């Protein structure tokens, strides 16, 4: 076949495809040859497998496809399949009368491209040329991959060699250049740090710069960068220490300020003795005068159990004990300051009206004051201070006649002037006030016919004397308060030199004293007592409607 004929065959493909048929059965071999020729294939036949192998070895490039029987006497078809695939790399189609899947699987595993059953049909042979085309494409792909992989391997090897050469050159350059070597790390020892501190102290913290510090330290292998880094850390630590010192100083100042104010307990309006009293609502006011110093007394909180002694206004020219920082409201619960309105307002309250003087309540509650004489200046700008009278020890046996009508004794609470304001120019208390225990009496008139008309009993009713009367006064002046719910604070009794004591007794002591005097005295003719037939016994006192409880 000439070159031109081969080109024509290739152009007319699959016409003229070269096929080698191998089968030990001559009948089957003749039928297979006839069918292949009808498909216009170029056919070569043989009945021995060994002969077919020799033909293939002699003519490697003269066959395109091999069709071989499975069962042959001289050589198994699968053996021929392996040899052809290894040596010539041609597509092989297996032909057999066994349709067992085991044979088909075995042929596929050994490299067969197809498995045909006898008798073979012409329709199956018409499309066998596709295996030739597929095989040729696989060969081209393998060749391209092999060429590409070879080129890639060469390129990778070349790049790797170049990279290794460059690294070797860089290592050589690093070894040759001493400046390119890594600088050793500086360890700031205690000695080195002391030199640094000495240099900073010599230059000053503000003027210390790394270059000057380095010159003063004069240490080998110490660079300017090392000194600059250490100086920055030193300044940060110094700033932190200074900030902590400032905070501690501020905290100490605040603590000392509160230590000076530690005596200001209770309500905020009652200040220490060295502070001025602010003028405003809810405060004792007296202009710019100082509030006298009171010693702390735990009995002050016992409002309803203390003896309700008279408050005597005194001058503020008494000596002050500056070491005592007590507060008159120390330890006083807020609940005890709230006096119930239903207990007849027994404790007259102070008010906070501006420019109004302090008042001296005189709710005696069958009690009498300690004999003492006092006087107040009539200057309205003067702010008097209050002292608590001495604990009462006995009841008065003498009654002083008063001008109070019997009908007024049992009048309603609203008609009684328990509290009243007075003008700031007027004196606080009548200067002719007689504080003799005998002058303070109790005139009740229990036998009055008006007693059945009211449900409230007032233990004491006193009449106010005219201002120009020089006689003894039996009723303390009362001034009305704008806050009737505010309770009266009771505390210490007066001692010599204006000092205060804290031995005020409770109402239990008073009642016991009353019972003792009742048993020891048999004549009550001097007092105006009328108990409507009741015996003077303990049951009589239980009938008295005190504004507060007699129990402790």
Swiss-Prot record:
Its GO biological process annotations read: callus formation; cellular response to cytokinin stimulus; cytokinin-activated signaling pathway; maintenance of shoot apical meristem identity; primary root development; regulation of anthocyanin metabolic process; regulation of chlorophyll biosynthetic process; regulation of cytokinin-activated signaling pathway
Q: What segments bear the compositional bias annotation Acidic residues? A: 163-177
Coarse class of the protein's main subcellular location? nucleus
Q: Where is this region: Disordered?
A: 139-181
Q: Which residues carry this modification: 4-aspartylphosphate?
A: 69
The cross-references to Pfam families, in alphabetical order and at most eight, read: Myb_DNA-binding, Response_reg
Chain residues forming the annotated DNA-binding region:
185-235
Where along the sequence do coiled-coil regions lie? 151-173
Record's comment on post-translational modification: Two-component system major event consists of a His-to-Asp phosphorelay between a sensor histidine kinase (HK) and a response regulator (RR). In plants, the His-to-Asp phosphorelay involves an additional intermediate named Histidine-containing phosphotransfer protein (HPt). This multistep phosphorelay consists of a His-Asp-His-Asp sequential transfer of a phosphate group between first a His and an Asp of the HK protein, followed by the transfer to a conserved His of the HPt protein and finally the transfer to an Asp in the receiver domain of the RR protein.
- Here the disulfide bonds are none
All copies of domain Response regulatory, residue ranges: 18-133
Task: Supply the alphabetized keyword list.
Answer: Activator, Coiled coil, Cytokinin signaling pathway, DNA-binding, Nucleus, Phosphoprotein, Transcription, Transcription regulation, Two-component regulatory system
Q: InterPro entries from the entry?
A: ARR-like (IPR045279), CheY-like_superfamily (IPR011006), Homeodomain-like_sf (IPR009057), Myb_dom (IPR017930), Myb_dom_plants (IPR006447), Response_reg_B-typ_pln (IPR017053), SANT/Myb (IPR001005), Sig_transdc_resp-reg_receiver (IPR001789)
Q: Which GO terms describe its cellular component?
A: nucleus
List the molecular function annotations (GO) for this entry: DNA binding; DNA-binding transcription factor activity; phosphorelay response regulator activity
State which tissues express it. Answer: Detected in the whole plant. Predominantly expressed in roots and leaves.
Motif Nuclear localization signal boundaries: 182-185
Q: Where in the cell is it found?
A: Nucleus
Query: In terms of domain of life, where is this protein from?
Result: Eukaryota
Purpose? Transcriptional activator that binds specifically to the DNA sequence 5'-[AG]GATT-3'. Functions as a response regulator involved in His-to-Asp phosphorelay signal transduction system. Phosphorylation of the Asp residue in the receiver domain activates the ability of the protein to promote the transcription of target genes. Could directly activate some type-A response regulators in response to cytokinins.
Query: What family does this chain come from, according to its entry?
Result: Belongs to the ARR family. Type-B subfamily.
Q: How does it assemble?
A: Binds the target DNA as a monomer.
PANTHER family documented for this protein: TWO-COMPONENT RESPONSE REGULATOR (PTHR43874), TWO-COMPONENT RESPONSE REGULATOR ARR10 (PTHR43874:SF7)
Tell me the protein's name: Two-component response regulator ARR10
What lineage does the source organism belong to? Eukaryota, Viridiplantae, Streptophyta, Embryophyta, Tracheophyta
